[in-house]
Regions:
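Hydrophobic, well-ordered secondary-structure elements that form the walls
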Residues: 25, 167, 201
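Flavin (FAD/FMN) cofactor-binding core of flavoprotein oxidoreductases
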Residues: 208-229
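Non-transmembrane alpha-helical segments in soluble domains
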Residues: 34-38, 198, 202-205
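Glycine-rich loop(s) and the adjacent beta-strand/alpha-helix scaffold that form part
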Residues: 7-82
Length: 229
């Protein structure tokens, strides 16, 4: 393979500059680290047809599902109070911490209920069936903001040969570099694992005092989609 001896970048005037270095650290997050190596000619890009190459092979991330618990008006969650990531985590269903007999999957994940300071843009809990905007949405948000708790499931993501990263043969960025292309779908193993975790989280939510309704979302379910970058 090749050895990185520095970094080429564009300065504020758009001029190409080479900065030599004895050590080059990749610190652009996993996806962009892979892209940097690919456009720099470092390593062999994975070819799914032949199975050769390691760069971009077996891309995996995390498998997300969640429960929203809506409480009666006498039960207050006060989402604006907390330390940013204050909460409790159940680790009983992570990895090999539980018996997988007849479950049909390997892996697992943690189940967590936490407070993130009720961030005004990120935290907008409304019951299922609420319109996405308008007066009814505002009314629902006002009524549920202080009577809601979220429970999230962060599950494992098993690597498969069908999930990988490579360079797009068509699309390029403003500087002429090929864009990163992701080929990914949840394997059946992860779908089963996520459904199992979600059932456990929903069970916890239903047994909370004061809960009047719950809703669930499984991002790995068949037909579901979300940004995994």
């Amino acid at each position: 393979g090749k050895t990185a001896t520095g970094v080429t970048y564009l300065d504020a005037q758009g001029r190409e500059v080479f900065q030599p270095a004895d050590v080059v650290c990749l610190g652009a997050y996993a996806l962009w680290n892979v892209q940097l190596m690919m456009v720099s000619g470092l390593g062999q890009i994975y070819d799914p047809a032949t199975g050769e190459g390691t760069l971009g092979r077996n891309y995996s991330y995390q498998t997300i599902a969640a429960v929203s618990a809506y409480f009666d008006e006498d039960t207050w969650s006060n989402p604006f109070i907390g330390a940013g990531a204050l909460g409790m985590t159940v680790d009983d269903y992570n990895g090999d911490n539980f018996d997988h007999t007849d479950l049909g999957f390997v892996g697992g994940g943690y189940i967590s209920a936490n407070q993130t300071n009720g961030r005004p843009i990120n935290y907008q809990p409304v019951p299922p069936g609420t319109p996405g905007w308008g007066a009814e949405w505002k009314r629902a948000l006002r009524d549920t903001y202080q009577h809601h708790v979220g429970i999230v499931c962060h599950g494992s993501s098993m690597s498969t040969r069908a999930n990988y990263l490579d360079l797009d043969p068509t699309w390029r960025d403003a500087y002429g570099q090929p864009l990163m292309r992701m080929t990914f779908d949840f394997p059946e193993n992860d779908r089963r694992m996520s459904a199992f975790l979600l059932d456990r989280a929903a069970e916890i939510a239903r047994n909370m005092d004061g809960v009047r309704e719950i809703s669930t979302v499984n991002r790995a379910a068949e037909g579901a989609a979300y940004s995994i970058v």
